[in-house]
């Protein structure tokens, strides 16, 4: 799942030759289908939204629950690309987050599930496939999501291999008996099963929670994006072909996303975007007082995040907002990335926001007439892809 965020760029480069290798496509709700058919992803009013899901049906694989039947969305990431193509925001939803799930019918079994007012978000895929997961996140955020994709664990392994591995920093040793992952402190190049184990590791990082795993995944994602945008990966046709084949042969796409014009358009929206404008955030949550294994939506902070996404505002994170299992790399200042737009604050360097009673804070205009970044509440953790961070083992 980690490498899917760059697949829009890489896969689109040879989409015409590779789309046939995708296992199959799925339909979303009627409204989402119509939007995907009629809209141009490069010029969608309010920006483009894509839901990316990671799942595997193999019971007992690594850190999964051994009594689980069927697929669950272990990873749920909403990608918002601004209409002006100046920022990408990837919002990770904890799998242990309790949310309302609408009534859904499983497309494979025909089983109907009634609407639930409080259910774990990772149950939505099993209730009604990709479409149900999309409807769940739409209801939660108030956004329209016309595009979606699901990748299996095998896809993560093959795509990391195609890239020749991803370099990650480990601040404290990781020793996870559940995934078998053992990493000493320092730099590591991860691919194949090691890359998958790193992305799946929960017990080996931070405080052992799913929230810690999300911040560790953001370390990997950011390192991956820096790699593919800095070493010529996207201009290497051999690597692109391998990456595209690995992605599409292990992905299920919504009908609207499984179109050559859509993937090529997606590539054009990301082309030239600075990694400082690629922002990873965790959907804001609070502990469930009745069950410490679960979390609930932080209503105030979530409202602010939802509003800025709905209004397609450029955003920034407060200082020192890395997650539960990440910290700034000691070598972070050795290869600084310049920002070509002085009016835009770096995604990870905004001031903390106290919020307002009426919704998200307003963004002031920059010196060149471009709106400056709206700072997100300090309770929202994450980082930009340009920030060099390390995963903290426990």
Regions of interest found by a model, annotated:
Residues 1-394:
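Non-catalytic, solvent-exposed segments at the cell envelope interface
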